[in-house]
Design a protein with these regions (language model features):
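Short histidine-centered beta-strand/loop micro-motifs
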Residues: 3-4, 52, 73-74, 231-233
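Ferredoxin-reductase
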Residues: 1-65, 112-114
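Well-ordered beta-strand segments characteristic of repetitive beta-sheet solenoids
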Residues: 37-39, 80-84, 222
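FNR/FR-type flavoprotein reductase catalytic core
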Residues: 49-207, 211-214
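Hydrophobic residues in beta-strands and at strand termini
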Residues: 15, 25, 39, 73, ...
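Short acidic/polar mixed-charge low-complexity motifs
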Residues: 17-19, 206-208, 227
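Immediate flanking context of iron-sulfur cluster ligation sites
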Residues: 211, 216-236
Length: 236
């Protein structure tokens, strides 16, 4: 049996190159016979997703650590809104099953450019079709606004959001007026550097010094210098 896990949890996969990447568990909650993860291949990303797709085949073994969970479904929350964007569906799908099993009053909005590019869409809808709203930009002729994503979410509604940074930030700003309402989110990419200042970074082993511009991170500068630099989640 694999280690137990809870909805929102993830594992840290060690790739053959030495890279480490975090992937949310998106199978049935608590399943321990096997784990399911979803990996979107990103051509212009950091290389981890391409390596996952190219290095492994059916029957291969993965080396991983975990599971861990910093994005879990609160035990005492009874009125919940889930906001989903793109591959952000992976940690939230098991939460939907758990919320349904706990008889929580929940609703979900799944937004994306088109239904074709919304991973696991059928599985999300099948949890409870009357509780899930699908927003496809190509059907509406525009992106979903925070008002669209949070319709009927009241001042006491707990909100869980996982998706692209613009979606996450719009929801976060919209919920600022409800300071006491729980807001839970998980980022799959780092937030942009805002109001930064340039600085110099000394690499301890090589004693080399890199200049980091005001609008970039230390890791960005290291990757510019050596694209094979190993890193993990980029969340700091």
């Amino acid at each position: 049996m694999l280690p137990s896990w809870t909805p929102g949890g993830h594992i840290d996969v060690q790739l053959p190159s030495g890279r480490r990447r975090q992937y949310s568990l998106c199978g049935p909650p608590g399943r321990r016979i096997d784990y399911r993860i979803a990996v979107r291949r990103i051509a212009d990303g950091g290389g981890g997703s391409i390596e996952m797709h190219d290095a492994f085949d059916v029957g291969d073994s993965l080396v991983f650590e975990g599971p861990r969970n910093a994005f879990y479904l609160g035990a005492g929350e009874r009125d919940v809104r889930f906001v989903i964007g793109g591959i952000g569906v992976t940690p939230i799908l098991p939460m939907l099953h758990a919320a349904q099993q706990r008889a929580i009053n929940w609703r979900a909005v799944y937004a994306g450019s088109s239904r074709e590019y919304m991973p696991l869409l059928d599985e999300v809808v099948s949890v409870a079709p009357d509780r899930v709203t699908v927003w496809a930009d190509d059907e509406h002729g525009r992106f979903a606004t925070a008002d669209d994503l949070l319709v009927d979410a009241g001042p006491a509604t707990a909100v869980y959001v996982c998706g692209p940074t613009p979606m996450l930030e719009s929801v976060r700003i919209a919920r600022d007026e409800y300071a006491n309402a729980p807001l839970h989110y998980e980022r799959f990419s780092p937030p942009p550097v805002v109001d930064g200042v340039p600085f110099e970074l000394e690499l301890a082993r090589s004693r080399r010094v890199l200049t980091v511009p005001a609008n970039r991170s230390a890791l960005d500068a290291m990757l510019d210098d050596d694209p094979t630099t190993a890193y993990s989640c980029r969340q700091g």
